[in-house]
From Swiss-Prot:
HAMAP family: SecB. Homotetramer, a dimer of dimers. One homotetramer interacts with 1 SecA dimer. Belongs to the SecB family. Gene3D superfamilies: SecB-like (3.10.420.10). This is Protein-export protein SecB. One of its GO terms (biological process) is protein tetramerization. It is found in: Cytoplasm. One of the proteins required for the normal export of preproteins out of the cell cytoplasm. It is a molecular chaperone that binds to a subset of precursor proteins, maintaining them in a translocation-competent state. It also specifically binds to its receptor SecA. The gene is secB.
Length: 161
């Protein structure tokens, strides 16, 4: 019976593991260079969103994923505000093959972080006395597939730092 329990435990150790350890804000910034004059103008905003992800291997099977959302909102030709959040998470990921690990870090983890980043960004904008910023959901699987296609065409290999 002891041998069966030991063998069962060994089999479990080889099964894929995924666990969210921590979610945190790594960096947060807000600038409203034309305040307070911008509040007296007719509000006709144009929004530019820049999204980026980075991964870094930590000790053992732990990985940090950082999702950066940068938003620049202009009212006419003037910058109304610039807001940026770096939402990060520490994930325990083990026993995945290289393609699965790459997809998990490049799409699955950012998908978990996005609602937190979106909320932090929206809170920042409303605290600056601007209208709420309602960012649409992001298809990280599609973005990941596009990046893999780009890397394949360029002859690059996906890496985890």
């Amino acid at each position: 019976m002891t041998d069966q329990q030991t063998n069962g435990a060994a089999a479990e150790d080889n099964s894929p593991q995924f666990s969210l350890q921590r979610i945190y804000v790594r960096d947060l910034s807000f600038e409203a260079p034309k305040s307070p004059q911008i509040f007296r103008q007719t509000w006709e905003p144009s929004v530019a969103l820049d999204l980026n992800t980075k991964q870094k291997s930590l000790e053992g099977d732990f990985h940090e994923v950082v999702l950066t959302l940068s938003v620049t909102v202009k009212n006419g030709d003037e910058v109304a505000f610039i807001a940026e959040v770096q939402q990060a998470g520490i994930f325990l990921i083990a026993n995945l093959d290289a393609p699965s690990m790459s997809h998990t870090l490049g799409a699955f983890c950012p998908n978990i972080l996005f609602p937190y980043a979106r909320e932090a960004l929206d809170s920042l904008v409303t605290r600056g006395s601007f209208p709420a910023l309602m960012l649409s959901p992001v298809n990280f699987d599609a973005l990941y597939a596009q990046e893999m296609q780009r890397m394949q065409e360029a002859g690059e290999a996906p890496t985890v730092q």
